[in-house]
Amino acid sequence: MSIRSLAYMRIEATDMSAWREYGLKVLGMVEGKGSDPDALYLRMDDFPARLVIFPGEHDRLSVSGWETANAAELQEVRDNLSAAGVAFKEGTAEQLQDRRVDELITFEDPSGNTLEAFHGAALEHRRVVSPYGHKFVTGEQGLGHVVLSTTDDEASLRFYRDVLGFRLRDSMRLPPQLVGRPADGKPAWLRFFGCNPRHHSLAFLPMPTPSGIVHLMIEVENSDDVGLCLDRALRKKVKMSATLGRHVNDLMLSFYMKTPGGFDIEFGCEGRQVEDESWIARESTAVSLWGHDFSVGMQP
């Protein structure tokens, strides 16, 4: 496939100071530099920024950025979008400068989520040393994974699988009532897609959210780093969304917490890596092997 990894997220924010505290003091990222003096550029590795937070009137996901290997692979994305009748725009000079890439295109999925595909990122070779000593699991696996909200799970399945070429790794059946369908109606599906060895880089939930994003997963190297982040979050009174647990599909050991933007970050380790030649996509019938009590997120 042409798309290789989730490379960056651009997030509009109403409280930049809260995001600065959260990104640097809770997540343990390192501040980078960029062309927008008002934006916060958060580094995890040699990418110029994996998260870009910029001020605005809303708290929402603005763009998810997806990396291709070269100009030929980006052209494949263009060709596939054109064949499917999906409009796209070429990146402006300002966008290319801000993302520090050679080329990019912008387009929307069937639910209106904005995506960018690009190639030729200019890496930043100043070492990233987290103030808390941990390293993020990125490289060919990219930033992590993102769960987007969708208004049509069937259309999203066709778009990401058939147009963009993502590989379906797992599915989870949800009660139809969860998305406003009758009890005897079609089930809703939570789909998990991969584009590299990470079990999934993308999933979508058929439920609208104010921010357009359900959660973003960030992975570190070991369970101590997860526990230390949990301690930092609790000390800073960050609202928890789910307790520590281990998922059944990607085996991630993680907890969930709220961001200043209202969506969740899953902070975890030990995520499963797969090989497409031998992987068999199946249906998961549980969320976690243990833990992940999401009721804590519903408490006042």
From Swiss-Prot:
Effects seen without this gene: Cells lacking this gene grow on cholesterol at a rate that is 60% that of the wild-type and develop a pink color consistent with the accumulation and nonenzymatic oxidation of a catechol.
**Cofactor binding: number and manner:** Binds 1 Fe(2+) ion per subunit.
> Which InterPro entries does this one have?
Glyas_Bleomycin-R_OHBP_Dase, Glyas_Fos-R_dOase_dom, GlyoxalaseI/FosfomycinResist, HsaC, VOC, Xdiol_ring_cleave_dOase_1/2
* Class of enzymatic activity (EC top level): oxidoreductase
Under SUPFAM superfamilies, the record lists: Glyoxalase/Bleomycin resistance protein/Dihydroxybiphenyl dioxygenase
User: Per its record, what are the GO molecular function terms?
Assistant: 3,4-dihydroxy-9,10-secoandrosta-1,3,5(10)-triene-9,17-dione 4,5-dioxygenase activity; ferrous iron binding; oxidoreductase activity, acting on single donors with incorporation of molecular oxygen, incorporation of two atoms of oxygen
**Pathway connected to this protein:** Steroid metabolism; cholesterol metabolism
Q: Which residues bind Fe cation?
A: H145, H215, E266
**Keywords, alphabetical:** Aromatic hydrocarbons catabolism, Cholesterol metabolism, Dioxygenase, Iron, Lipid degradation, Lipid metabolism, Metal-binding, Oxidoreductase, Repeat, Steroid metabolism, Sterol metabolism
* Name of the protein in question: Iron-dependent extradiol dioxygenase
Which organism is this entry from? Rhodococcus jostii (strain RHA1)
Q: Please name the gene that encodes this protein.
A: hsaC
